[in-house]
Amino acid sequence: VFYSVARTERSTDTCANTACDRSACPCCGHLLTFDYYHYHHIGKARCPHCGFALPEAVFQAAEVDFDHCRFTLRELGQAELSLPFRGGNLFGVFNTAAAVGCCRMLGLAGADIARAIEEPELQTGRFESRKAGELEIVTMLSKNQNPISSTQSIAYLSHVPGKKTVVLTITDSLDKVHGHEDISWLYDTDFDALRDESVETVYIGGRRCYDLALRLILSGVAQEKLQLFPDYGELEQALIRQAPTEGTVAIFFELYAKPIAMGLR
């Protein structure tokens, strides 16, 4: 059983990302043709040489409304469902469509699933948003050493209106336990959204803040935007002193840095 996401307003005709891994047909090795890309190598692909194509989806997410975080789930032979998703990005659509499809395969009624999704008591997770007066504070997981996850998290900023302050704690927060020396993944990650003039300040925390700062500068982010803090305590104090009172503060954190991100929030 397969599921998919139809073309959205954010889909592109060519790969818009630095990393686009799956370009060859898994059957014959010739180049794939994409009807559209969602991000990186995720989209609707087919092979003009041997006829390979993605299988027909039993469940398809369509009519994605990013502004209101809703989409329509179409199931072969069944009534359509209007469903919400979290996070404001396509990850939320894929995750919700997969979960609902699984529930349908287990025999749950579509109406019951939709009602349960509309009324959950959500636990803290990879995306949270809350208001403090005129200021919106967003925390979002950006998986360490995963350029696709990191690119999609950073791209969220492109669709956030108004002035933005960004906090990056996406490199090794626990070097002594889960340490590594590989920073090549930073160069497969797209940081284009940070170049926008609406992003006023970028705080970078952690022992690898200088590596990340160099990557941002090489990608065209203005150096004067950057504030570097190898020590997370100093980063927290700087945020307390300089935090804006309106707009958006977006805190991106790697897998092991969630306690740090929650403290900064």
Please tell me what each predicted stretch does:
Residues 82-90, 137-139:
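A short glycine/serine-rich beta->alpha loop
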Residues 19-22, 29-32, 39-54, 101-110, ...:
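ATP-dependent carboxylate-amine ligase
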Residues 1-84:
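Extended acidic/charged loop-beta regions that coordinate divalent cations
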Residues 20, 87-98, 124-125:
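Short glycine/threonine-rich catalytic loop with a Thr-x-Gly-x-Asp
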Residues 8, 64, 76-78, 88, ...:
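Generic structural motif
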